[in-house]
Amino acid sequence: GLGDVYKRQVICGVVATGCGGGNDDDRIEIEYWHANGAALTTVLEEIKADFEAKNPDYKVKLVSYGDYNTLRDTITSAIAGGIAPTAAQTYPDHISLYLEGEALQSLDKYINDPVNGMSKEEQAQFIEGFWAEGTIYDTAGTRYGMPFNKSTELMYYNADIFAKYGWEVPKTWDEVIEVAEAYKKTTEYAEAIKANPGKVYALGYDSEANLFITLTQQYGAVYTSFDANGKGIYNAFGAVEADVLKSKASMNWYLEEFKKGNIATSTAFGTDYCSDAFKAGQCIMTIGSSAGATYNDGQAATGVKFTTGVSAVPQKDLENGQVIQQGTNVSLFKCSDAKEELGGWLWLKHMVSYESALKWALETSYFPIRYDVLNSEEYQNHIKGNIIADDGSVVEGIQTLAAKAKEAGLAQSQWFYTNVAFPGSSKARDNAETIVQQILYGDSMTVDKAYTDAYNLSLIHI
């Protein structure tokens, strides 16, 4: 079976070391597989050039796959065939899959290495929530990833209508409902309903999986965890009664407010994202990715143009803030060639270094992953839209919506949560999405049955 195939020695690098580059190039080749698009790959090429200049014994071969699922499936097949890249971009669910194949190298032995490792001071520079996601794969907290491109969710709102009626931007879900009830009494709402009967709400949530997990945790429940034997369990779906009850309370609440026409998800608008509905006036608040700010820009609306505001994800209780962190990490595979594996580690260490992380934060829509980058003069000027004149003086600029999103997103970092990852946890996300869709849009589906169905489906995958 697949397990037996997996157990074979994994040989890193599709090209055997030493014969990849011909006689004129005896550098050791590091293969890095990723799923970044063209614009991000350009930045990656710059990071690679820096690395090769500093490490003349190594060369990096960047191999791009169109999307994250293709990347995951290609690596899984490669592992089964006894080959793998030296290093790759990974989501937590991918990491747990590769661990089934015993193909990943723990980063702890390299981090703790006296020569090529990473000091405690250096490790402390990483934003805690991002750094913690590297150790969610077993009860021992073994590190299999370091953060690379990171984003979160935010609330975007129509700042013009908020200003017109003097509404405070809601920080809690109770306040969201207050705004929603006030909104339903406005002429704007009446006009929107006339134009889009049955498809107007105060707030739309993009990701139904994120909605389920985030609300479950805001209500004080645990979504998934490891049991006493280190096996992954689905607390909120059915494994732990106390967690199930709290999670169901969150979904029952969302359902009630949905029925009142206050809040919905992207499915209500017939789309995967609420951004078009938001720009069309079908909702005045939307929760979506911090990396997708430009899609929610009211200045790009086809009808009445408006200013988009950015704020934190609403909470049930501000004392127990819970916000998802999104995006990928970077991981190292076990190699039969020790020099290649060391090179892979050095490459990953370079990718998350101050210089590389600063470049990534300045040139992409993703967050700084480190405090020293966040607090740097370059990043602070970038985020404020300031221009540096030829004489070195700073000219105050105008902050873009994308920059506002980066700033507001990281301001929530104390609320970032991570969920443990194990074989089957990615399927749990799919089932979480299904629960929300069934409860809100399914024909006569009860909350209890939606949970039972999801739990039974999840157990098949363990």
Question: Where in this protein do the model-derived segments appear?
Answer:
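Short, small-residue-biased leader/transition segments that mark boundaries at the very start
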Residues: 1-6, 462
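Short, well-ordered beta-strand elements
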Residues: 26-37, 58-63, 87
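Extracytoplasmic "Venus flytrap"/periplasmic binding protein-like
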Residues: 50-129, 160-171, 275-277, 284-285, ...
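Extracytoplasmic/periplasmic substrate-recognition and gating elements
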Residues: 59-61, 141-142, 164-165, 241, ...
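Hinge/lid segment of periplasmic solute-binding proteins
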Residues: 93-152, 194-197, 215-217, 226, ...
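Extracytoplasmic/periplasmic solute-binding protein
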Residues: 133-148, 153, 177-236, 255, ...
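Glycine-centered hinge/linker elements that transmit conformational signals in sensory
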Residues: 180-181, 228-267, 313
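C-terminal capping/gating helix-and-loop segments adjacent to ligand/active sites or protein-protein/ligand interfaces
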Residues: 389-455
